[in-house]
Amino acid sequence: MSLNPRDVVIVDFGRTPMGRSKGGMHRNTRAEDMSAHLISKVLERNSKVDPGEVEDVIWGCVNQTLEQGWNIARMASLMTQIPHTSAAQTVSRLCGSSMSALHTAAQAIMTGNGDVFVVGGVEHMGHVSMMHGVDPNPHMSLYAAKASGMMGLTAEMLGKMHGISREQQDAFAVRSHQLAHKATVEGKFKDEIIPMQGYDENGFLKIFDYDETIRPDTTLESLAALKPAFNPKGGTVTAGTSSQITDGASCMIVMSAQRAKDLGLEPLAVIRSMAVAGVDPAIMGYGPVPATQKALKRAGLNMADIDFIELNEAFAAQALPVLKDLKVLDKMNEKVNLHGGAIALGHPFGCSGARISGTLLNVMKQNGGTFGLSTMCIGLGQGIATVFERV
């Protein structure tokens, strides 16, 4: 494949094991430490990359307060081998934060404003709860329905609009856990999970190299017993069909194609297009549809050209309508989230965009795909998408 010098390539990707936010493996690890450990280890395994060449560390994080405050990108960067002369910024596009971090780095590379970037994101939802310090403007209800800020209710709305049944949602959730467990057992996550110290349920310190969030014993029967989590009367969305509240971080090394070539590196993929889009906040989960349509148009592709897809599983009731309208629902088992998704692995807000993108690149590498799409919905009505081509 012939690459242009300013094409944007992904050199490597790593992530932490995903930990449960309630009493999980990361309960005694701070978000900055988690991020710094991950960045350091990813750089260590790419010895041809001089940390001094890093132009900027761009880190996604949603709730930027407590240990995640004061520009956590810089806080983490200072605790790594990256010199103080490299810059760092923290970005937030809610659920799409670390994918936005990737886009920001890509746009800088394309315009000649740097050659080497470290991007990713973190969210420690056990230490900094999703609503900590949040004070929504009461006047917002004049412009958008109050329930638009309640993600579970927006999923209920989207599922109802598209005729998604409780049974379909439960089956989707079981699939997520089964595929994530299968990927774990078969070593499919080995290249992406960076082992970390953590604490087991008995309080013993150990090395984790697997996601503790996956529940392989999940069944249709066990999910059917759960009560609706957001709309007690007539709702279909349960805790079992929603993304898990978890702690985790993800990291990528992103470069210009020319710099990667100069260093003798073999990239995982090149970015072919990027897009963001807005939708009515009441159906925030629909955002991946217009974002994907824009990204495909910019890449000169259509859905039939896409070999593999990673769609963030915010809710089964949200993911299924998106797949339906992208015309890939009937191809889900061949193309979509082949290693499970956020229902099994969790959705640490600031981490997820780079996480699903990196997992996608590994799926493409393991299965020989050419084009891949990573996309996700974003709270308050947005979507974000990236199209990759395997190098």
Swiss-Prot record:
One of its GO terms (molecular function) is acetyl-CoA C-acyltransferase activity. Pathway: Lipid metabolism; fatty acid beta-oxidation. GO terms for cellular component: cytoplasm. Its main location: cytoplasm. Coiled coil: none annotated. Belongs to the thiolase-like superfamily. Thiolase family. Catalyzes the final step of fatty acid oxidation in which acetyl-CoA is released and the CoA ester of a fatty acid two carbons shorter is formed. Heterotetramer of two alpha chains (FadB) and two beta chains (FadA). This is 3-ketoacyl-CoA thiolase. The gene is fadA.
